[in-house]
A protein has these predicted regions:
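Short, basic/aromatic beta-hairpin or loop at an interaction surface
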Residues: 60-67
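Active-site helix/loop of acyl-thioester processing domains in fatty-acid/polyketide metabolism
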Residues: 31-60
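Soluble ligand-binding/transfer domains with enclosed cavities or grooves
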Residues: 6-11, 29, 39, 44, ...
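Segments adjacent to and within acyl-thioester-processing domains across lipid
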Residues: 114-161
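Catalytic strand-loop segment that frames the active site of acyl-thioester-processing enzymes
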Residues: 4-32, 159-161
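Hydrophobic beta-sheet segments that form the core/acyl-binding groove
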Residues: 67-115
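Short helix/loop capping segments that flank catalytic or ligand/cofactor-binding pockets
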Residues: 19-23, 100-101, 117-120, 127
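Active-site loops and adjacent core secondary-structure elements that bind or stabilize anionic groups
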Residues: 1-2, 113
């Protein structure tokens, strides 16, 4: 069920030449990776869903892009050490409530007022992050290490005595 058909979020970053990502992208051509701009947009979308109250009844859940949808990402500019400001904008098109709340939005990043990144109708959803089924070896290891259980609140711990 669609509960909202529009919304807006804006985030700004003052760019400094000493930011961590400049040294790690292109040799002798420092810039922010376009994938990092996209990740910042996804984080802003996640914040929007969380601020809308969708995480309150879903403790332990996480955000992920909707994998079944194709996305067209356009990088047309760069954030460089001489840039002054990166602005990330999320133009919410639709918020769908249901078993997995989903947000659909257009994304735009501008650098010093010039369009640098655009993505049309990107979707992010809130999904359970438990039980841990993706890495059964971690579950087995945790079950075998009863010291952690006893120390941090499991059966036989100081907290339950």
């Amino acid at each position: 069920m669609c509960i909202r058909d529009s919304g807006y979020l804006r985030a700004e970053l003052d760019v400094r030449p000493d930011l961590w990502f400049f040294d790690g992208h292109f040799k002798n051509d420092p810039c922010m990776p376009g994938t990092l701009m996209f990740d910042g947009c996804l984080q802003a979308m996640s914040f929007y869903l969380a601020a809308s109250g969708f995480t309150l009844p879903r403790d332990g859940w996480r955000f992920r892009p909707v994998a079944e949808l194709p996305y067209q990402l356009q990088c047309r500019g760069q954030v460089t050490p001489s840039s002054r400001r990166l602005v990330t904008e999320v133009f919410v098109e639709e918020v769908v409530d249901g078993p997995f709340p989903t947000l659909f939005a257009d994304l735009l990043c501008t650098v010093d007022g010039l369009k640098a990144f655009h993505a049309r109708r990107v979707a992010i959803e809130l999904v359970p992050d438990w039980p841990l089924e993706a890495m059964p070896a971690l579950l087995a290891e945790a079950a075998a290490d009863t010291r952690l259980m006893k120390r941090y609140g499991g059966p036989g711990s100081r907290a339950t005595r």
